[in-house]
């Protein structure tokens, strides 16, 4: 159907075309066009650059329409297939489903990490804007900000009771925050020579581990703030460190393409795991409840015998996720499907699924037993950098380079 422009719209369009021709050096075409369109004088200020702005706006709108169509298609598919309600599914089968419950804005830069508080109905987001924000994930309300770092906050972690929060930053520091009363920074620990990229509590809560671009991992005593151990072995920037639930070992991953398993007490590297073709961005320990599902998946890949674990999942810039039996240093199987870097992994509390966040802007839910993704959430407008699954309640949270934090309900 032919669109009819008003006289005023035609005049503005002609002026915008003339402005575009003139600003891009098409002098002959401009002269001919001005004569044909009967344009005299200079373009109004509001007309300058208008054609380019309109064009880029159309492209953005087309992109948004495509994303909305994908979401609509996903929703229609769920209706047709009769996605069961939460009441008809056991908690072990709840998975996040669109649309998001909340999309939270407030940070002025990319989100680097999102985590749930272990007991309160709170979640935290860390950002490149050097701020940690606290939100109520049930209401979507902003609670407060924790300020103290002077550069990007790279990672955050709670102790097992949620009384202390640890944070680390590109400002080379690790900070401990009182999460019971004051929300104040109670200790600042310095010792790394470069960006501190990851932090994790030992389960007992008396020590904190930090990983850095200086290629070392340090152990800090919570009571004194002193560094009591340094672990060396990686040959490049260490991206993440995560402690096993038993508190005896921990894992680290690096730009050097490797994953290392360490003894907490001895400083010894117990194993080096290699199979990824690029930087290993993230790692996650599998809960004991995942053992059956992982063994069934490994069995179908002809890995003979029952694997005892412990089991670890790793995500890489090579776009793959690998699941390892750390006890024998064996990669049991590979999950493929993401179209860009895998940024973070978290296991479903029921043990049946693994959830991943990626630079392809999606969150994927993986069925471990069948080694395939069963759900894709088109989560953000930009890279999806972080994801966390609540251990008791049906919620997933995600963070992105688009500066937003999203809350997803599971059913």
Swiss-Prot record:
GO biological process: cell division; establishment of mitotic spindle orientation; microtubule sliding; mRNA splicing, via spliceosome
Primary residence: cytoplasm
GO cellular component entries: centrosome; cytoplasm; microtubule; microtubule associated complex; U4/U6 x U5 tri-snRNP complex
Ranges in a coiled coil: 56-83
UniProt-recorded name of the protein: Lissencephaly-1 homolog
Function: Positively regulates the activity of the minus-end directed microtubule motor protein dynein. May enhance dynein-mediated microtubule sliding by targeting dynein to the microtubule plus end. Required for several dynein- and microtubule-dependent processes.
Domain comment, as recorded: Dimerization mediated by the LisH domain may be required to activate dynein.
Superkingdom, taxonomy of origin: Eukaryota
SUPFAM superfamilies documented for this protein: Lissencephaly-1 protein (Lis-1, PAF-AH alpha) N-terminal domain (SSF109925), WD40 repeat-like (SSF50978)
UniProt similarity note: Belongs to the WD repeat LIS1/nudF family.
CDD domains in the cross-refs: WD40
Gene Ontology terms for molecular function: dynein complex binding; U4 snRNA binding; U6 snRNA binding
WD repeats: 106-147, 149-187, 191-230, 233-272, 275-334, 337-376, 379-411
Gene3D superfamilies hit by this protein: 1.20.960.30, YVTN repeat-like/Quinoprotein amine dehydrogenase
Lineage: Eukaryota, Metazoa, Ecdysozoa, Arthropoda, Hexapoda
Subcellular location: Cytoplasm, Cytoskeleton; Cytoplasm, Cytoskeleton, Microtubule organizing center, Centrosome
